[in-house]
Structures are given as C-alpha cells and as structure tokens.
Amino acid sequence: MFKIKGLRWYMIGLVTIGTVLGYLTRNAIAAAAPTLQEQLHISTQQYSYIIAAYSACYTIMQPVAGYVLDVLGTKVGYAMFAILWALFCAGTALANSWGGLAVARGAVGMAEAAMIPAGLKASSEWFPAKERSVAVGYFNVGSSIGGMLAPPLVVWAIMAHSWQMAFLITGALSLVWALCWLYFYKHPKDQKKLSTEEREYILSGQEAQHQAGNAKRMSAWQILRNRQFWGIALPRFLAEPAWGTFNAWIPLFMFKAYGFNLKEIAMFAWMPMLFADLGCILGGYMPMLFQKYFKVNLIVSRKLVVTLGALLMIGPGTIGLFTSPYVAIACCASAALPTSPCPVR
C-alpha cells in the first residue's frame, strides 16, 4: 500500500483546520454584533450576557469534554463535538432575541469545549515528546487564523444576504470538516498509510503511557494538588480576559467608539488576531535569541519573554489617550501579540 511520508504533519494540519473553523464559529457572533444590535434591538449589556453564556458553558464543559474524549477516543469524540458545534452554530440563525442567541451560543460553547483538549490529545498520539510543542504551536495558530477570517467572511455574508447566512455558512464549514475528520483521522497504530519507520519514530519517542495506551487517569484532587497545573492555570486566569476581549468585543468597540461601518470592521477587526499569530511564532524563537545575544540561561530567557509580553499588555490601557481609531487598533494589536507566547496559550 502507498505510504505517505511525514503523515504526522498532515494530521496536525487537519487538527489546525478544525481549530480555524472552531474559532471562526466562535468569533462569528462578534463580527455580527453591530448588525444584531440594530436588527434585534439588543443592548450592549444584553450582548455581554450572550458572550457570558458561551464562556460559562465552555468553562463548565471542558473537564466533561476531556472525559468524553478519553472514553470515546480522539477520532469519534472530536467528530461528535464538532458536528454538535456546527449544528448549534447554524441553529443560531433561528434566534430572534438576545435570549435565543444566549441559548444558541451557550450550546456552541459546550460543544467547542472539546476543541483544545482534542487537539492536545491528537498531538500526544501523533508526535514524539520532543516535537509535541511544535505540533501544539501549529494548531494553536489556528485559533487566531479563525479570528482573522471571521470579520471579512461574516461581513460579506451579511452584506450579500443576512446575518443568519453568516451563521449558516460558518456552521456548514465546520460540519464538512467534522465529516472529513471522521473519515481521515486514525491513531498511528491503525493508520495503514503510515510508514513503518515513521510509526516507530512516533511511538518510540512517546512517554511510556502513550506507548502502552494505558495512561492512568489522575483524580480531580491529584490535579488540583499538582504544581504544574497551577503553573498553567494561574497565567491563563490572568491573561484570558484579554484574549476574550479580542475575540468578542473588538468589532463592537470599533462600531460604538469610532463609528466604523461593516466594511471598515471587515478591514481592521482581524488585525489583533494577526499579531496573536505572530506572537505564537515569535514566542518560540525569542528565548533562543535571548540566550544567544544576552547570554542568559533558559529559565531567565523564558522569564524575559513573559515580562516583555506583560509590558505590551499595557497598550489597550492607553487607548483613551488617543482619538485616532487606527492608534486604538495598534494598541489592541500590541496587546494581542503576547497572548500566544505567554503560558496562557
């Protein structure tokens, strides 16, 4: 049978496309917010409830989604969640009030809670430990790409047809991807198009529990007592409000504060996401550059990256000092840059 060279990179490419489409469906509500406010007479406070519904359901469902993925496996579990978020996203088109939108987006949040855990699980299955951070970096880039695509695509759908069409299109794209995932994704042990050499390279470079396929699950109490867990959770808790702001509020901010029309939103609202992508790439190289040119060790170099990121986060706090909308966008973009290299991402 024909073997595909470097098949693991095709698999992470498939994961990345799923992340792109997941964040496209997530950010569609933000790009459509000005139109929704006008046509459904939704206040800014009511819009915040819609966003809160998504975030709350996403948060509550994440540990449940991780458990379901462990039980059903990456292939079936991720496909199931992706089909659900695609249908719920398309179902958003049926809403005619802020309450209906909150229910629909909450359902999307519950399904999309599996997106990042599934990506991490696929990376652990398909990559040796030494390459896993690179693989995770690739599919994390998909989150920003999805955020970049949402404003122009959603605005185009609204101007060409209606806001309902924007959610139907984004939902349909995710549904197509879910079916492709179900067809193409297999564990390395079951993938017949994977060469023997690459299979051995992947499995020999994995931790013992992945090789044997019998990783022991940690209890909730063990996780909460784990220092590594808190090393990831605390930075995320502190940085996630910024990332959530970029995902949910920039189009509406540009519309309310600077009077941008839909075309202008489509032209500029994606820029912070572009800088988040750049940060995701640069964040991997900056520690090496600090070590090379400043002669510091690995730990210090990583601390310098995090410190530099924290300084850049000051940008949005200075928006009130300027009247130019383009300076405001630049301030937001500067703060989006470190959301990827920091531990939160």
Curated annotation (Swiss-Prot):
Keyword field: Cell inner membrane, Cell membrane, Membrane, Signal, Transmembrane, Transmembrane helix, Transport
Reactions mediated catalytically: aldehydo-D-galacturonate(out) + H(+)(out) = aldehydo-D-galacturonate(in) + H(+)(in)
Keyword Membrane part of the UniProt annotation: yes
GO cellular component: plasma membrane
Superkingdom of this protein's organism: Bacteria
SUPFAM superfamilies the record matches: MFS general substrate transporter (SSF103473)
Location (main, coarse): membrane
InterPro entries with a match to the protein in the record: MFS (IPR011701), MFS_dom (IPR020846), MFS_Na/Anion_cotransporter (IPR050382), MFS_trans_sf (IPR036259)
Disruption phenotype: Mutation of the gene causes a reduction in growth on D-galacturonate and maceration of potato tuber tissue.
Localization: Cell inner membrane
Disulfide bonds, paired cysteine numbers: none
Induction of the gene: Induced in the presence of D-galacturonate. Expression is regulated by ExuR. Maximal transcription activity is observed within 8 hours of bacterial inoculation into potato tubers, well before any visible symptoms of disease are detected.
Pfam families the record matches: MFS_1
One annotated GO molecular function: hexuronate transmembrane transporter activity
Membrane topology: Multi-pass membrane protein
Signal sequence coordinates: 1-32
Membrane-spanning parts: 49-69, 76-96, 100-120, 139-159, 165-185, 237-257, 265-285, 304-324
Keyword presence, Transmembrane: yes
Family label: Belongs to the major facilitator superfamily. Phthalate permease family.
Protein purpose: Transport of D-galacturonate. Cannot transport the dimer digalacturonic acid. Uptake is an active process.
Protein name listed in UniProt: Galacturonate transporter
Organism from which the protein derives: Dickeya chrysanthemi
Upper taxonomic lineage: Bacteria, Pseudomonadati, Pseudomonadota, Gammaproteobacteria, Enterobacterales
